[in-house]
């Protein structure tokens, strides 16, 4: 045994000796039955077979251990203890002094006994007992002399019995089985859901692919249809150029101007008019000659001696021939019929001329549209914002173009208004324009009313252009309709005004209220293109928000004086003073009165044939203290009274939008009752007058 100890590495031997010497000396030589548990604890040595100090003889030690502070206590004689002394235990004479455990020995037995016959406390699961068993097992696996090794056990009392432990184990196992079953179910459900997700994902990808194909095909068909419509419009325009006329470039000095030349349809009408005028002149000349040949009446019968002279005058010439009374009346009746026929023909020519003028206006408008479309950078059907496919140009303004487009996402037609800034503008001016457009967008975006055009979207194209997407209406605006038809019936005009007032009422009921300020026929869209359908209000570029910060009792300040359309603005907008004028929703009331007047009479009540500059210079609106009504066409007194209430000069005396909405003329049942009351009162008055006259008789 000592030979085996001698074969240890010197460094390991020294460490072992220092370890055991320190433990043993601390307790003295009498307590050297220290346990091996510190030596055989888990992880303290390598996996090689343990070499005990007994395997090495004492005389083979060639170097001394380092001094230890406990050596003075451990030296009882002339030499130190052997390593084998630390593996010997005094049978029951003392207590164990293992520094690693610090547990007093309770029972001593051989390793075979401790492993094969564990105490009851160990079987019941005592933690200290299990620790002792593990320690003993570790020691027996590393020691070659099991007879010299003793294991210590400590018995502890536990409340668990084998039945309870078995019950706990069975409950735990059942719970574990349930959990495992639940886990299996959840895993199956998870797998099913994942499979469904994969299927739905594949279906979604398939649907997206189909949708992209449908959108692509829709774009292709829409572009093809738009191209065909463009070709048809240009062909029709070329045909109408010969029939209705065209623009020609004429040179005046160093400049060139465009001059309109009428087509053959107008030339034919002019020739017909000239022919009718010539025939009328000839008939008038013959009527004058007929008057000279008029025979004398019966009271002026010529004497008999004048009969030969009469025959003589007949022989001199037919122009001096005297007609009988019957011949004279017959010839006069023929001339009257011819004049009546020429008058009827002239009226037909005038009607045809007016019709051709309306068609010519459409033709001129189409020529300008085609010219602007050909010069536009968006003529080749681009898709803006990956959503809006431009089809054809609807119109062009000062800084904007309006295109009919198709919304590929919502699958609907829309009107795309492209705002293009002048590249030569200063950055400050561009910023102000963009700020103004953003303000219009914010105002218009929140509005939701059937009589107001909806604003769908707003986006930028580049630094100098941006777009607004509006609701598309098929028809034209009221201004174009009035240019075509001059005027309309009172019922049609009243229907339009009712819808406009309904929209204004909505604008003044929301918070904060809004003044449109630019209400005119050009901003009233006819949905069906006729005066007997629905209308929608658009263009909120000059609108005013009546918030609490800007609006007071007497109105809000007009910061944009000079803007707007002067024919439809009230006098307070033209007042010039130290402070800007105050306005309210009564501005829109004045505009309603002007529009209603124009619809009924075919002209504006103030400044009809004047330009905006002339109106401003001559103070036309400031002088419009009273409205005058022409005798024709005939208009009801209620309509005239309604117009007078709208066109009151002083804004303090003018009704507001809420009073306008409740006006009797715009409420059918009230208007009928008022009319019936008026008729009954007139009937009563006439009855009383007749009774009074009969009584006086």
Curated annotation (Swiss-Prot):
PROSITE patterns found in the cross-reference section: PROTEIN_KINASE_ATP, PROTEIN_KINASE_DOM, PROTEIN_KINASE_ST
Gene (name only): tlk2
Main location: nucleus
Protein kinase domain span: 388-666
Residues annotated to bind ATP: 394-402, 417
Sequence intervals crossing the membrane: none
Residues making up the signal peptide according to the UniProt record: none
Cofactor entry: Mg(2+)
EC number in record: 2.7.11.1
Alphabetized GO MF terms: ATP binding; protein serine kinase activity; protein serine/threonine kinase activity
Compartments it resides in: Nucleus; Nucleus, Nucleoplasm; Cytoplasm, Perinuclear region; Cytoplasm, Cytoskeleton
Domain of life: Eukaryota
Quaternary organization: Monomer. May form homodimers; homodimerization may enhance autophosphoylation and enzymatic activity. Heterodimer with TLK1.
Enzyme class: transferase
Keyword line: ATP-binding, Coiled coil, Cytoplasm, Cytoskeleton, Kinase, Nucleotide-binding, Nucleus, Serine/threonine-protein kinase, Transferase
Organism (species): Danio rerio
Protein name listed in UniProt: Serine/threonine-protein kinase tousled-like 2
General function of this protein: Serine/threonine-protein kinase involved in the process of chromatin assembly and probably also DNA replication, transcription, repair, and chromosome segregation. Negative regulator of amino acid starvation-induced autophagy.
PTM description: Phosphorylated. Autophosphorylated; phosphorylation promotes the assembly of higher order oligomers and enzymatic activity.
Family label: Belongs to the protein kinase superfamily. Ser/Thr protein kinase family.
Coiled coil: 265-294, 336-373
Catalytic activity line of the entry: L-seryl-[protein] + ATP = O-phospho-L-seryl-[protein] + ADP + H(+); L-threonyl-[protein] + ATP = O-phospho-L-threonyl-[protein] + ADP + H(+)
Segments of skewed composition (Basic and acidic residues): 46-61
């Amino acid at each position: 045994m000592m030979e085996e100890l001698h074969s240890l590495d010197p460094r390991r031997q020294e460490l072992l000796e220092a370890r055991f010497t320190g433990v043993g000396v601390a307790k003295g030589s009498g307590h050297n039955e220290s346990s091996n548990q510190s030596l055989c604890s888990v992880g303290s040595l390598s996996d090689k077979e343990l070499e005990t100090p007994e395997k090495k003889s004492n005389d083979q030690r060639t170097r001394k251990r380092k001094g230890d502070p406990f050596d003075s206590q451990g030296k009882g004689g002339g030499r130190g203890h052997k390593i084998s002394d630390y593996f010997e235990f005094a049978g029951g004479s003392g207590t164990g002094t293992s520094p690693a455990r610090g547990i007093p020995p309770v029972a001593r037995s051989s390793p075979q006994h401790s492993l094969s016959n564990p105490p009851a406390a160990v079987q019941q699961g005592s933690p200290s007992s299990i620790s002792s068993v593990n320690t003993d097992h570790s020691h027996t696996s590393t020691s070659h002399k099991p007879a010299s090794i003793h294991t210590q056990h400590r018995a502890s009392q536990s409340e668990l019995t084998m039945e309870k432990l078995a019950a706990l184990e069975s409950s735990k196992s059942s719970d574990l089985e349930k959990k495992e079953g639940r886990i299996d179910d959840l895993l199956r459900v998870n797998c099913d859901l994942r499979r469904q997700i994969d299927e739905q994902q594949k279906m979604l990808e398939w649907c997206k692919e189909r949708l992209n194909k449908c959108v692509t095909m829709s774009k292709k068909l829409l572009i093809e249809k738009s191209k065909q419509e463009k070709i048809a419009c240009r062909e029709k325009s070329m045909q109408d150029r010969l029939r209705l006329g065209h623009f020609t470039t004429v040179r005046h000095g160093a400049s060139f101007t465009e001059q309109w030349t009428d087509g053959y349809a107008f030339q034919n009408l002019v020739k017909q008019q000239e022919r009718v005028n010539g025939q009328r002149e000839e008939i008038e000349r013959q009527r004058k000659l007929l008057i000279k040949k008029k025979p004398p009446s019966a009271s002026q019968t010529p004497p008999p001696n004048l009969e030969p002279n009469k025959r003589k005058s007949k022989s001199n010439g037919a122009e001096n021939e005297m007609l009988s009374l019957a011949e004279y009346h017959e010839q006069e009746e023929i001339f009257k019929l011819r004049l009546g026929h020429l008058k009827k023909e002239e009226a037909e020519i005038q009607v045809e001329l007016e019709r051709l003028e309306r068609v010519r206006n459409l033709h001129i408008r189409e020529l300008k549209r085609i010219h602007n479309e050909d010069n536009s950078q968006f003529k080749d059907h681009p898709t803006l914002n990956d959503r809006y496919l431009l089809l054809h140009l609807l119109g062009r303004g000062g800084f904007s173009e309006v295109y009919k487009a198709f919304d590929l996402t919502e699958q609907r037609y829309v009107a795309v208004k492209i705002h293009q800034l002048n590249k030569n503008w200063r950055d400050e001016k561009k910023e102000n324009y963009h700020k103004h457009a953003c303000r219009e967008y914010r105002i218009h975006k929140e509005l939701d009313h059937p009589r107001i055009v909806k604003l769908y979207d707003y986006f930028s194209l580049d630094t100098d252009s941006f777009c607004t997407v509006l609701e598309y209406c098929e028809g034209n605006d009221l201004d174009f309709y009035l240019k075509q038809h001059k005027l309309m019936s009172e019922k049609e005009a009243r229907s339009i005004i009712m819808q406009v007032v309904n929209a204004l009422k909505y604008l003044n009921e929301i918070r904060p209220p809004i003044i449109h300020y630019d209400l005119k026929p050009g901003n009233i869209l006819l949905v069906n293109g006729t005066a007997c359908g629905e209308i929608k209000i658009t263009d909120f570029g000059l609108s005013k928000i009546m918030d609490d910060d800007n609006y007071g009792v007497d109105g809000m300040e007009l910061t944009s004086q000079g803007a707007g359309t002067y024919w439809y603005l009230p006098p307070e907008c033209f007042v010039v003073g130290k402070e800007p004028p105050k306005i309210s929703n009564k501005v829109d009331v004045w505009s309603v009165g002007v529009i209603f007047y124009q619809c009924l009479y075919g002209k504006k009540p103030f400044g009809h044939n004047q330009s905006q500059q002339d109106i401003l210079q001559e103070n036309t609106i400031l002088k419009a203290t009273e409205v005058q009504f022409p005798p024709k066409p005939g208009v009801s007194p209620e309509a005239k009274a309604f117009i007078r209430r709208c066109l009151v000069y002083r804004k303090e005396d003018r009704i507001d939008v809420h009073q306008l909405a409740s006006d009797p003329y715009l409420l059918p049942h009230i208007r009928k009752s008022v009319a019936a009351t008026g008729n009954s009162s007139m009937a009563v008055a006439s009855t009383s007058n007749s009774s009074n006259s009969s009584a006086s008789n």
